[in-house]
């Protein structure tokens, strides 16, 4: 029995998560879904965007499936990542047949350090009209995120990928913080002589994910850079509606679509569930359910290729109808 903490959150989270639950139930696996609250609505009602009982539920479950955060995102999803110590944010970038993309051969993963950098939340107003933010980079956090990235590249190499890790940084300007980041990257790389290691400045990397995305395998970077880079990368494979993510730590896993709460379309049942379904695929693999994960991804690929999609991808199905097309194919497997 897999015990899953389900947090729908705000906006379209209340649609894409239930739609994804349809697909998970179609696998026939023994799930216990434990629902918890977080986000703008619960904040307005209780004064807490992330209630203690939600934190306790998340810590008690085998994994967390999260929908979307609104205005309280920093107090919800960012805080939850820190509480669960999910230090690695995995954001796959993959082109799917039937979806307009930059190139059909795009298939790489961005690994973002999830606990440090400018998202550490250390800010202050030191004088009227003057504010500062502190960027934190530590050797310990660098070592564990780089080992995670190299281990991922090793696993992908077994599946026929190149076996390469690219580090994106700005060490030429941020000489101390990114200087340390780059130094530890190559130190850890020495432990993986079967995996190629290279580095690019983040500004150049931002160009390369558009001009030559097919050359990348695993890209590793710091918190803010990873957040920006991965959203841009999503634009090359169809947009945020197809961008899943996993937040992985030594003891916990938190899975969420990259997109936000999209209040402009919330309640209309037209939100694309693909990113959340793909996040659930990552969750299934995290739980060791590889066969079920492959079934769901294959079913989703078929649905996308046939154009059985929501309006943003040119289809005419609603959120739940698209999810049911996936679920139906999973059941038929």
From Swiss-Prot:
Entry's InterPro entries? IsoCit/isopropylmalate_DH_CS (IPR019818), IsoPropMal-DH-like_dom (IPR024084), LEU3_arc (IPR011828)
**Record keyword Magnesium present:** yes
* Site positions (Important for catalysis): 119, 170
Xref: PROSITE patterns: IDH_IMDH (PS00470)
Q: How is the cofactor bound?
A: Binds 1 Mg(2+) or Mn(2+) ion per subunit.
| Record GO biological process | coenzyme B biosynthetic process; isocitrate metabolic process; isoleucine biosynthetic process; L-leucine biosynthetic process
Principal location class: cytoplasm
Principal EC category:
oxidoreductase
Q: Which GO terms describe its molecular function?
A: 3-isopropylmalate dehydrogenase activity; D-malate dehydrogenase (decarboxylating) (NAD+) activity; isocitrate dehydrogenase (NAD+) activity; magnesium ion binding; NAD binding
Q: Which reaction does it catalyse?
A: (2R,3S)-3-isopropylmalate + NAD(+) = 4-methyl-2-oxopentanoate + CO2 + NADH; (2R,3S)-3-methylmalate + NAD(+) = 2-oxobutanoate + CO2 + NADH; (R)-malate + NAD(+) = pyruvate + CO2 + NADH
UniProt KW keywords: Amino-acid biosynthesis, Branched-chain amino acid biosynthesis, Cytoplasm, Isoleucine biosynthesis, Leucine biosynthesis, Magnesium, Manganese, Metal-binding, NAD, Oxidoreductase
What does the entry report on temperature?
Answer: Loses 50% of its activity after heating at 80 degrees Celsius for 10 min.
Keyword Oxidoreductase belongs to the record: yes
Q: Main role?
A: Catalyzes the oxidation of 3-carboxy-2-hydroxy-4-methylpentanoate (3-isopropylmalate) to 3-carboxy-4-methyl-2-oxopentanoate, which decarboxylates to 4-methyl-2-oxopentanoate (2-oxoisocaproate). Also catalyzes the oxidative decarboxylation of 3-methylmalate to 2-oxobutyrate, and that of D-malate to pyruvate. Cannot use NADP(+) instead of NAD(+). Cannot catalyze the oxidation of L-malate, L-tartrate, D-tartrate, DL-isocitrate, or DL-lactate.
NCBIfam families membership: LEU3_arch (TIGR02088)
What is the protein named?
A: 3-isopropylmalate/3-methylmalate dehydrogenase
The top of its lineage is:
Archaea, Methanobacteriati, Methanobacteriota, Methanomada group, Methanococci
């Amino acid at each position: 029995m897999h015990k899953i903490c389900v947090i729908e959150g705000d906006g379209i989270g209340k649609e894409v998560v239930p739609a994804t639950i349809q697909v998970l139930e179609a696998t026939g696996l023994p799930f216990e879904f434990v629902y918890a609250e977080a986000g703008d609505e619960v904040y307005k009602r209780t004064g807490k965007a992330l209630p203690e009982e939600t934190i306790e539920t998340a810590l008690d479950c085998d994994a967390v499936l999260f929908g979307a955060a609104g205005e309280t995102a920093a107090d919800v999803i960012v805080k939850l990542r820190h509480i669960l110590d999910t230090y690695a944010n995995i954001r796959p970038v993959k082109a799917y047949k039937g979806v307009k993309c930059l190139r059909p051969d795009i298939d790489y993963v961005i690994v973002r350090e999830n606990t440090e950098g400018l998202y550490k939340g250390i800010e202050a107003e030191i004088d009227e009209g003057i504010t500062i933010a502190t960027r934190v980079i530590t050797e310990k956090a660098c070592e564990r995120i780089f080992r995670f990235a190299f281990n991922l590249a090793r696993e992908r190499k077994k599946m026929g990928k190149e076996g390469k890790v690219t580090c994106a940084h700005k060490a030429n300007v941020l000489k101390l913080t990114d200087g340390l980041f780059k130094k530890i990257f190559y130190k850890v790389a020495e432990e993986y002589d079967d995996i190629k290691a290279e580095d690019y400045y983040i500004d150049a990397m931002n160009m390369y994910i558009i001009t030559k995305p097919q050359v990348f395998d695993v890209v590793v970077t710091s918190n803010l850079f990873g957040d920006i880079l991965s959203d841009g990368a999503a634009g090359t494979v169809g947009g945020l509606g197809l961008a899943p993510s996993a937040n992985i730590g030594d003891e916990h896993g938190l899975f969420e679509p990259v997109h936000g709460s999209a209040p402009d379309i919330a309640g209309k049942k037209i939100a694309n569930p693909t990113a959340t379904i793909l996040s659930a695929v990552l969750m299934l693999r995290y739980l060791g359910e590889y066969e079920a994960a492959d079934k769901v991804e294959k079913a989703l690929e078929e649905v996308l290729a046939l154009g059985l999609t929501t309006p943003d991808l040119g289809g005419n199905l609603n959120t739940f109808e698209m999810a049911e097309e996936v679920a139906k194919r999973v059941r038929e497997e």
